Amino acid sequence: MNRSLALFIVSIALWCASAYGQATSRDNAALVLDTLGVWRIHETLKPPVIQLDDGLKPIQSTYDWLDRETAPAPADWTSPGFADGNWLRGGARAASRTPYLANLCLRARFEVTDPAQVKDLNLSLTYYGGAIVYVNGQELVRGHLAKEGAPAMAEAYPPEAFVADDGKMLPAPNWLMEKYPKGLAARARTLANVAIPAKLLRKGVNVLAIEIVRSPYHKILDEKKNQAADKKELATRNCPYDLSWNTCELRRVQLTAAGTEGLVSNASRPKELQAWNSDILTPDYTSDFGDRCETPRPVELKGPGNGYISGKIVVGSPKAIEGLKVTCGDLKQGDAVIPAANVRVRYAVPFGHTASNSDAYGNNAAELDSLLETPLASFPATPAGKGAVVPIWLTLKAPKDAKPGLYTGQVTIEARGEKALTVPVRVEIAGFSVPDTQDYRTWVELMQSPDTLAIEYNVPLWSERHWAMIADSMRYMGEIGSRVVHIPLIAQTNSGNEQSMVRFIKKPDGTYDYDFSIMDKYLDSAEKCMGRPKFTAFIAWEIYLNTPKQEVKFTGKQDVPNHDFDREGAWLAARWELRGKGPAVTAIDPATGKLSTINLPRFEDPAARAIWKPLFDQLHQRMARRGLEQTMVLGMASDVWPNKEER
């Protein structure tokens, strides 16, 4: 690696660490709270504002819904006793990054055991816009704002924050901005080493609250409207201004002390197994940990009778979590009991090996977004989170005749070498029941993919293990009311099926017989696991049969912004190569069982009818025996239709 490149990479790494607080605090200081710690977040959204010569002007978008304002935080949000459990939970950088963010409110907790022993408690933050800091409800400091009151707007930025010395718009705030140190310096605002006096502290839980207030956009954006450093971004913009960076954003925050005397750090996970609450709509990451100052609340599940109702609790440890066992007891309301057997426990793990480099969650943090029915023998610790994290999902199948009201119970969490944790569970059953899943009025149509399962889990197509996975996936689809079964009669469609579900057997006289064994077993599984289908879609046509009117050669050139190559050209060229060929199907040799792919005559060829009509006659008979003949339809997973001759 040459020296200049090495220095460039090091400079980028140091900038990232200082910008987002992922690495260090003050020399020899104890880190009490950090950017990647546990924060509660509230956002107020409004249209962005530009400062013109005649005053402030809201920047309206082309979408009315985008301009709707959201509610401000409650007036007492800075007080220590404010209930923030319903606010977004995450690192300080998990907040929305948008020009529409008008006010950003954040709360974090830390424990003080003896205020008199706390030494050199200091706060530093970097932000865009203006900032007000509160400790236990008392204002500590503010920056780039009016000295008093609750300002709606922070100090304006100079032109250098928006345009380079050559008059061109600056790029979005990513690593490209390293080329523009003047612009970076103009944007970043800081409150550095602000001392927190002991008189603001109290024994027990203390609350640090931060409000970030937006600044207006400079009038130079009006002079440069319909211009952008990123031309691709300009093509997708819904307003004439380049709003490529946000004037209301917290970039970095650290609370440090001279040592740990008199307080307990809340910037990293504790040494023991820990549990914390997480909303089911909030993603969980391997870097997450719980708030030491917050006792886990009950896991709450709310929903109707006969419905599937979920909640979750997350556990974490600085080491691998081994022998994880979760036991849910019966749920009771007086004499009414919902048995524990109605509760399914699942365990979230990363899907594949993807990791995030987002500064919101820490480098290489992975989202825990795939559910396992049984726990791993060992949930490994990861470098990103310096430990292991396991979200535990509780899903209740509420009885159809469940008595409405509040049921209570508890879940016990055990792990090898750890003290067992007990978390209360509260289930609120509404005064109505939903229909069975196949009677939902909401139309749900998911396409089950046998080939995806075979490839993802490396199992042979149509093996017993494969059929078990198909049954599981159909069971999941049935639980949300999916009601369409797709039967590909042709192979190699853009839905990903390598084979057709009906095998074609060529007879000595040139006609065909058909092997329905795969289709029959697939329909058996669908009826058993998903429910009676409302439609059975037989797929007999595919986009590769649509031949371009003239020869197309793949150039490899870019056709659409943000595309890496000429995708449309690649598709058309591939279809040109298949010109004259009919639909691909899977053929089977009845003597050997060997499979092969053959092309039948095109549908506009009269010979095709002699092959397909007998097939559909038999399909009608077989579906009639199942009582499903009225569900039969022709289907296509394509935006392109067959031509008149093919129909």
Spans of model-derived segments:
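Bacterial N-terminal signal peptides
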Residues: 6-17
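Accessory carbohydrate-binding/adhesion or oligomerization-edge regions at the termini
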Residues: 22-97, 109-113, 119-154, 181-265, ...
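Short, surface-exposed loop/turn segments at beta-strand-coil junctions that are enriched for proline
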Residues: 113, 199, 318, 397-404
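Short, hydrophobic/aromatic beta-strand segments
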Residues: 119-123, 134-135, 320-328, 405, ...
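Contiguous beta-strand segments within globular domains
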Residues: 120-122, 294-319, 391
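Surface-exposed acidic, glycine/proline-enriched linker/cap segments
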Residues: 151-194, 361-376
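Surface-exposed binding patches on compact interaction domains or structured appendages
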Residues: 262, 266-295, 318-394
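Aromatic-lined carbohydrate-binding surfaces of glycoside hydrolases
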Residues: 367, 371-372, 377, 382, ...
